[in-house]
Amino acid sequence: MKTTQIRIRNNCKIKNATKTSSNGINFKSQLEKTIYNCLLELGFSPEYEPETYTLIEGFNPMTPFYDKETDKQKEKRLKEGVDLTPSKLLVRRSSKIIGIRYTPDIRFYYNGIQIFIEVKGKENDVFYIKKKLFIKYLDNLYLNKKIKSMYFEVYSKKQLLQAIDIIKQNNESK
């Protein structure tokens, strides 16, 4: 298998991830495939990237905000001779702010509880905030609709097996 850099939804790179396939599913890494297949072997019915959740809706801001111009804007400005400053200038943005969305790697159900498994090889800078927002989303799901969930972030098959033990113990204690 060839090791490559691949892009994921939030435009962050997974470095040295090996794309791979199994059961007709294209996984973004070997670890995702291993975790998925392990869940199958243990008798679960995992879904790979089952759904994308909107954690914060996109919006049109009322507050004026300024950001550096894009490379295209800078190139156009320099070409037109409007301002020959070589660095990027601040420009007012009026465009819609895109929402924050999150797609968990794996979801399955166990005794009426939805279980989310986030398979991590390496973290990226966006993941931490999305993880917090998703856990808050799951809390609200329970408070408003009484839907129980559990969330696990695993970095190895060993951690997955530990997560399975926790899931089973949690179910037995009720």
What are these regions (language model features)?
Residues M1-K174:
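Electrostatic, structured charged patches in enzyme active sites and in nucleic-acid/phosphate-binding
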